[in-house]
Structure formats: structure tokens, C-alpha cells
């Protein structure tokens, strides 16, 4: 009879402990109801990227001296630089410059080490395509400046996201 009573007592204690754990979890769930939603409706709403965001590379053809530093510092030797040596002026003349964004890892080394600052990172990150060969950008495609997310009137930018709140109030 005694083991049966202690078994019921253990069962009662385990039931109370389980109810307490369920109550703690439910209180955490209820505490999240006052928070703002984190998700956004992507095609219609976009977050504003930070100024250090590494998006598509912008290339200025006139500034490039065909030194190939970008190719040497790239971990995957990605930029393709075609040039011709002009013997009468003893300088390289750039013929073609291209980057395949299907392979690019967006490390930013090419932008950081470029001596003439002809490469820069933009805030463009939409590379959706059905054909991977469309991700190979030549100097003409790299030279186009993308439309800023802030200037695009067709979408709504989200200013009160948790990321921007932390940047504005770093002490909170």
C-alpha cells in the first residue's frame, strides 16, 4: 500500500511540474504579442540597407587603368580584365571588363584594393533570373547605377524595423 501512495505522490508532483513548465512557456508566448512583426511583405516593402552593405559592384570604365589588382586580390580570380598594351604611350588600354555575379561571393576585396576607386558596392541585391548566364555583367551593365530603394516610389520602405531602431538608439 505504501509504494502505491508514493507513486501517486510522485505522479502528482510530476503533473504540477509539467503544468508549471507549460505555464512558463505560455507566458513567454504572451510576452511576444506586444512586439512588432519582424517579417515584411517583400516585393511591396523593403528594408533600407546599411551604408556598408555589399551589393552589386558598380564599375567606372574611364577610371580603370587595367592594373588587374582586383583579379589578384579576388579569392576566386573572378573579374575578367581584357586589355591591350599601347606601345606608343606605354600604357594599358582597357578593352573589356566583366564579373559573373553567379560566382561572386561579394567579399569586397576588389573594391577595397582598387587603386583608382573605379569599383564600388551598391545597395542592389536583386539578381533573380531564370538563366545563370544573365548574371555575367560586362562593363556596360556594371556601369549602370541602380535605383535607390529610398527613391523608388513603387515600394514602401520600412524605417521602423528592429535593425534601424538599434542603429538609432545604440544605448537602449
Swiss-Prot record:
Which Gene3D superfamilies does the UniProt entry name for this protein?
3.30.70.3270
Q: What do the Gene Ontology cellular component annotations say?
A: chloroplast thylakoid membrane
Extract the InterPro entries matched here.
4Fe4S_Fe-S-bd, 4Fe4S_Fe_S_CS, NADH_quinone_OxRdtase_chainI, NDHI
Major subcellular location class: plastid
The record's Pfam families line, in alphabetical order, gives: Fer4_9
Please tell me which top-level EC class this enzyme sits in: translocase
What SUPFAM superfamilies does the database record attribute to this sequence? Answer: 4Fe-4S ferredoxins
Give the family from UniProt: Belongs to the complex I 23 kDa subunit family.
HAMAP family reported in the protein's UniProt record? NDH1_NuoI
- Functional summary from the UniProt entry: NDH shuttles electrons from NAD(P)H:plastoquinone, via FMN and iron-sulfur (Fe-S) centers, to quinones in the photosynthetic chain and possibly in a chloroplast respiratory chain. The immediate electron acceptor for the enzyme in this species is believed to be plastoquinone. Couples the redox reaction to proton translocation, and thus conserves the redox energy in a proton gradient.
By what name is this protein known?
NAD(P)H-quinone oxidoreductase subunit I, chloroplastic
Organism from which the protein derives: Olimarabidopsis pumila
Which lineage do the record's taxonomy fields give for this organism? Eukaryota, Viridiplantae, Streptophyta, Embryophyta, Tracheophyta
Amino acid at each position: 500500500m505504501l509504494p502505491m501512495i508514493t507513486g501517486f505522490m510522485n505522479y502528482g508532483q510530476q503533473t504540477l511540474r509539467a503544468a508549471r513548465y507549460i505555464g512558463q512557456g505560455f507566458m513567454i508566448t504572451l510576452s511576444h504579442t506586444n512586439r512588432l512583426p519582424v517579417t515584411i511583405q517583400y516585393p511591396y516593402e523593403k528594408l533600407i540597407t546599411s551604408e556598408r552593405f555589399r551589393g552589386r559592384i558598380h564599375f567606372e570604365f574611364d577610371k580603370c587603368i587595367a592594373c588587374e589588382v582586383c583579379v589578384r586580390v579576388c579569392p576566386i580570380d573572378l573579374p575578367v580584365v581584357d586589355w591591350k598594351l599601347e606601345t606608343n604611350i606605354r600604357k594599358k588600354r582597357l578593352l573589356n571588363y566583366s564579373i559573373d555575379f553567379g560566382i561572386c561571393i561579394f567579399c569586397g576585396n576588389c573594391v577595397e584594393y582598387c587603386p583608382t576607386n573605379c569599383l564600388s558596392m551598391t545597395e542592389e541585391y536583386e539578381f533573380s533570373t531564370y538563366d545563370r548566364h544573365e548574371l555575367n555583367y560586362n562593363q556596360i551593365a556594371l556601369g549602370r547605377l541602380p535605383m535607390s530603394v529610398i527613391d523608388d516610389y513603387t515600394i514602401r520602405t520600412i524605417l521602423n524595423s528592429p535593425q534601424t531602431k538599434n542603429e538609432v538608439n545604440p544605448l537602449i
